[in-house]
């Protein structure tokens, strides 16, 4: 029997086949996929809403969830006090907004009203409760405010309170969180959810009849419930009285009730064919349970919540901000009163904060323009370059690169930290692949780390010792009997660890790190670089010759490194180092799901050293000198050190460059660490040894903020290094090298925007969302978080799965933000026609710019700046 016939028989909803699938797919736009915390990937929560403008989404979220996504008044006042907002930009923004409005009030009068309102002061409660003001509002009941009313469809459970005064939506959330934890748990418990292999809905349906948390009547509602999730969802919607035209909005409301758990469900549904309908199953479980809980209260008279316009605040705003007395108000004609009310309604809090945000962003853009203009130099005035080093575009690379260039004859480049290699990596002794590329891409090749058989056996034996200890501990912890004895057995050891880790973290950390290196010292390894035709896996192993040449050519052209090679070229991945930190993966590559970049850097450098690759590139005009050697290193962002991971046999000139880098690296680390550490809240005084302090932060397991990560990111600059060289960009800019003269077709620029540009935007808006709405898009305080089911963090044991960054990643103190919530400014160094072509050809990017999700500026070959 088809779903269509079941729906027609059991419900009043006349749907087409697969309509439920389409509605769920459309509704899912309001949530973003949430990666597990162990493979934390930057994402922004509004990625599915970019067809609407930022302003529209802000108004919509304020209406349906009461979530503000503009900076608060406190943030704005703080930024203005620091000189981050110029008043002139605010005034010009206000003038443009007033020009766009239609009103019949003297311009001077509305300007005076707006100027005072833009101080962002709250209306006094004494004024709002004043009898005269409330009487005025009552007497104006004849004013037509229908055009100003809002109505939104809310989940039925959110409209009902039980006899205990509990909102039924809170009770529903409690149940759903419980079932999500049971189904999604991959590592937390030894007893998994029965029938889990049959899917979320079927497993839930099997157990719900035994759930003691439900009443007998609630279980009775679900007793003979449909076996199919789609049918169950349609039936529940029908019995709740949701009309077909309102279904998508209703589903969106439920997805936004727990956006973290729903986001994790959505991510899981994208990972395998077996779980591709998991989001439908989630909604079937949730709305079926909603029906069971709310059944005694049905039917409701009205499921749409009408938000009538409050007249009192509108009148009070004109009295307080417009300097109109109650007597003057009474003497006005009704038409004028109505006009004033409508204007006050339009110039609401969102508009006021929007104007401040835009002024803040314009001030930042102007300050960046001046900084770049003051440092521009002739591109032909170049010093002798001893080594060239390519770093990830990550904002944390910028200070390190700046100090490196100051202290030695080096040239640095910015490139996406996976170096254009779409690979899944398999480290020595591992049977699992880990995608080592941005999460917006899928791996096309599998690269295995290899060594000889004897070395491999020895290494695997050493690994098994550590694995068996961890496995034994986990088994004892999860076993009913042994878990009671475990605290007594392990207490002394963990007590000693706690004391030493807290009071001598650097020394203990170094000891443990050295012990681990000794025990798990890798032998010399190679890679499976050559293509294997017959492979059992879905992803082919290695590269063909053409693929090797293509990936190297593509990366070198992307950064404009096709001539004038230095004797030593170093590909620098990056990684982080912290202890007792659930968000450790978030401090790795923000794009690559917690993957460090060292593996890719080593693979790329190895490819560049292959004679067959160099010969093919030389035939195309990219001639790499014979004495130029490619090496690989890893930039440790928490301690600002460079760790060599691949140094082949060096030529004489390359050895000189290598020795020079080694000699200045301690100074580079000291300068970079000092600059970075002084930004932390606990370091306002002079630091004697910055590198030692950085290591202490990395090893101290009580440290809640080992580094700032990518906080304060604000711009993505695409251009030659000369554009920003010697500029102190304060670790706020993503830097990607680009030479427009080598990109006649514009394809390289298009690829940078589609790949690294998208990733930078995701990172930027994740930090933005976690700052402006931490209660909804952040993850609260690290010190009170609970790591749940190996998936993510919760506050306590019954909260949403928290989707964003913790308080410590964006806040300097309880009252002071560290991250400046600005939308990403993309600056492209290229002629105007290149930008026009990009916008004409890339509809998605043009939409982001037009709808206010990113900002765009360009610098032409003559150094002229243009805001788009």
Swiss-Prot record:
The keyword Magnesium does not apply. This is Probable inorganic carbon transporter subunit DabA. One of its GO terms (cellular component) is plasma membrane. Belongs to the inorganic carbon transporter (TC 9.A.2) DabA family. Zn(2+) binds at residues 392, 394, 574, 589. Part of an energy-coupled inorganic carbon pump. It is found in: Cell membrane. Its cofactor is Zn(2+). Disulfide bonds: none annotated. It comes from the Bacteria. InterPro entries: DabA (IPR018752). The keyword Transmembrane helix does not apply. Keywords: Cell membrane, Membrane, Metal-binding, Transport, Zinc. GO terms for molecular function: zinc ion binding. It is a peripheral membrane protein. Its main location: membrane. The gene is dabA.
